[in-house]
């Protein structure tokens, strides 16, 4: 599909303050323009900004020629509870603020006329995050346009089958049956070209090569994989999970001559150009084989790799939450220059621009899904929506990550104390298995705070099986109430909405009346406790026997056990659980060298 920039000529208007609309270019973080006040309900987590709901509008001409075309609008990130309207009709809704999504415009456009697209981003429902989230359409937007015969978005999937000899598999989805061609290039020079045929998914001919200039691939050679003539696991999974209009695909298995492998020191990148009819899609990929096991840890192309990683959040400092390729690359460059070779997207899926930077620079990525499951850490966070959306969210994260050699694992969450309870242990397994069905080439982890899991299991904080059920119900109730309030506040998509912090924001610092000291709850309880007891006590606490009891079942439901602040458990657990692969998913900076010594 043709990808068209859709970032210019937008107008932004605040719905929670009486302000005039102003022109913006995406990406745009509306929170940066807000006043700050000590009465901010999001407090320091959002930099004492007041929060607000915003309306983005853009008028654009839709030509008559689009009548017979497939047109999607992609938003890489809207924070949060994004609503998309086209010519006054609601076309899409996406509650999670960190996953990209596509809006199908069929039935909404008026052809040969000016059209209006309107996006509402709600962030007056504070607090809803433990870190600065930004507000609005803070990542880029694009139009994707295609004719009758096209390759859908995320329709080209590339994986390495082996590195010695170098062999790759390319699966191409199409909207119709027909001939398609692939051209593999390295640094602008052609490596090989093949022509194949896309047929209905499940058809025995959908992996037929018509012609090839690859000496190791003969014309009409069948490239089926697996035993007994079965399709590869990837093809079977793709057929099952395919939810796009495309029902056709071609599968290519190609030997790459004189391959230049991808690793942290030599991040060699290839391009794959797939042509189907008049549609052309170009994907960048690297040839690298990832293996993980308890005996050697993790290897890339047969070489053991010790991760020297950092957790980082998605914002770009004074630039706010906006995603700019230059800023994303700058972060990775600084880390790389200081000896890091891996990063963790704490605690949300990272941007496409960041993945591109990691690919180019040889930085390994652990892409993380979410900071909260079904129990609140803040009052209006994602707990209320996760049950309905986690599968779609994970699918979109995998689609984004799949062709990037830098992505070496997925994380299903951060310090989700639900993993100490039966319901959470089951969800751990469900998420792991679902990710395996989407991508069998990468391991799955989850960052668990070992000591806090134990505390939650004895009722300190908000977590227990009974409380989990109640909190999950309350989460849905709170989300419904918040949505109801927002509907009442924005009656005609334009009437002013008001909250306490907004009113006080107009008056500078607001009321000077002393407030009652709040009792720490939820995540705040654990953060307060950590500050009081200190890092050494936390690490010692993690060695308690009950901590093992409250984490072992969840760890058994993932490929790699994520230890947050569990450095004192490593040697003991490696002996007790010889088949467990441990990742230091989070720790104190001063322990970095000790981690390195243990890992070696």
Regions inferred by a protein language model and the residue ranges of each:
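Accessory beta-strand-rich segments of carbohydrate-active enzymes
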Residues: 3-17, 30, 46, 51-154, ...
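Short aromatic-centered micro-motifs
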Residues: 82-85, 184, 274, 298
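Short strand-turn-strand beta-turns centered on an Asx-Gly dipeptide
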Residues: 85-91, 187-188, 277-278, 301
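Active-site mouth of glycoside hydrolases
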Residues: 98-111, 127, 131, 257, ...
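Extended acidic/polar, glycine-enriched regions
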Residues: 110-112, 173-208, 235-293
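Low-complexity, Pro/Ser/Thr- and charge-rich linker/hinge segments at domain boundaries
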Residues: 139-157, 288-303
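Surface beta-strand/loop "capping" patches
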Residues: 149-176
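Intrinsically disordered, low-complexity terminal tails and inter-domain linkers enriched
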Residues: 197-246, 467-511
């Amino acid at each position: 599909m043709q990808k068209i920039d859709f970032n210019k000529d937008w107008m932004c208007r605040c719905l929670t303050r009486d302000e005039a609309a102003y022109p913006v270019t995406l990406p745009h973080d509306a929170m940066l323009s807000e006043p700050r006040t000590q009465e901010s309900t999001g407090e320091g987590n959002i930099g004492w900004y007041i929060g607000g709901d915003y309306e983005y509008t853009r008028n654009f001409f839709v030509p008559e020629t689009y009548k017979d075309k497939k047109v999607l609008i992609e938003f890489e990130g809207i924070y949060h509870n994004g609503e998309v309207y086209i010519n006054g009709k609601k076309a899409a809704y996406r509650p999670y603020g960190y996953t990209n999504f596509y809006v199908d415009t069929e039935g909404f456009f008026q052809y040969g006329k000016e059209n209006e697209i309107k996006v509402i981003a709600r962030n007056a429902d504070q607090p809803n995050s433990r870190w600065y989230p930004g507000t609005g359409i803070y990542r880029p937007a694009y139009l994707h346009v295609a004719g009758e015969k096209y390759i859908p978005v995320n329709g080209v999937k590339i994986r390495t089958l082996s590195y010695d000899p170098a062999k790759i598999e390319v699966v191409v989805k199409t909207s119709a049956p027909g001939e398609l061609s692939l051209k593999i290039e390295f640094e602008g020079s052609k490596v090989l070209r093949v022509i194949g045929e896309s047929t209905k998914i499940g058809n025995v001919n959908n992996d037929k090569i018509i012609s090839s200039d690859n000496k190791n691939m003969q014309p009409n050679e069948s490239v089926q994989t697996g035993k007994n003539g079965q399709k590869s696991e990837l093809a079977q999974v793709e057929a099952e999970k395919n939810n796009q209009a495309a029902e056709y695909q071609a599968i290519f298995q190609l030997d790459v001559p004189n391959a230049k492998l991808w690793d942290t020191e030599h991040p060699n990148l290839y391009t794959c150009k797939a042509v189907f009819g008049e549609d052309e899609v170009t994907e960048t990929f690297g040839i690298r084989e990832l293996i993980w096991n308890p005996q050697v840890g993790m290897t890339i192309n047969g070489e053991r790799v010790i991760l020297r990683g950092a957790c980082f959040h998605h914002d770009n400092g004074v630039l706010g939450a906006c995603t700019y390729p230059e800023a994303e690359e700058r972060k990775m460059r600084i880390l790389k220059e200081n000896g890091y070779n891996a990063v963790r997207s704490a605690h949300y899926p990272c941007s496409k621009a960041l993945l591109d930077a990691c690919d180019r620079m040889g930085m390994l990525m652990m892409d993380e899904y979410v900071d909260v499951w079904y129990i609140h850490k803040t009052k209006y966070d994602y707990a209320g929506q996760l049950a309905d959306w986690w599968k779609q969210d994970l699918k979109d994260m995998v689609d984004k990550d799949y062709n990037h050699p830098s992505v070496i694992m997925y994380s299903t969450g951060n310090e989700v104390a639900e993993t100490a309870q039966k319901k959470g242990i089951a969800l751990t397994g469900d998420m792991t298995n679902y990710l395996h069905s989407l991508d069998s080439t990468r391991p799955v982890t989850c960052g668990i705070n070992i000591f806090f899991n134990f505390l939650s299991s004895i009722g300190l904080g908000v977590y227990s099986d009974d409380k989990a059920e109640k909190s999950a119900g309350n989460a849905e109730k709170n989300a419904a109430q918040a949505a109801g309030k927002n509907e009442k506040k924005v009656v005609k998509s334009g009437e002013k909405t008001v909250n306490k912090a907004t009113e006080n924001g107009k008056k500078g610092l607001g009321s000077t009346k002393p407030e009652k000291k709040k009792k720490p709850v939820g995540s705040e309880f654990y953060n307060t406790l950590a500050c009081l007891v200190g890092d050494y006590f936390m690490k010692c606490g993690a060695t308690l026997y009950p901590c093992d009891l409250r984490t072992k079942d969840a760890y058994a439901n993932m490929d790699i056990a994520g230890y947050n602040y569990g450095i004192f458990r490593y040697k003991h657990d490696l002996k007790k659980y010889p088949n467990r692969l441990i990742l230091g998913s989070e720790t104190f900076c001063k322990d970095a060298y000790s981690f390195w010594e243990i890992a070696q």
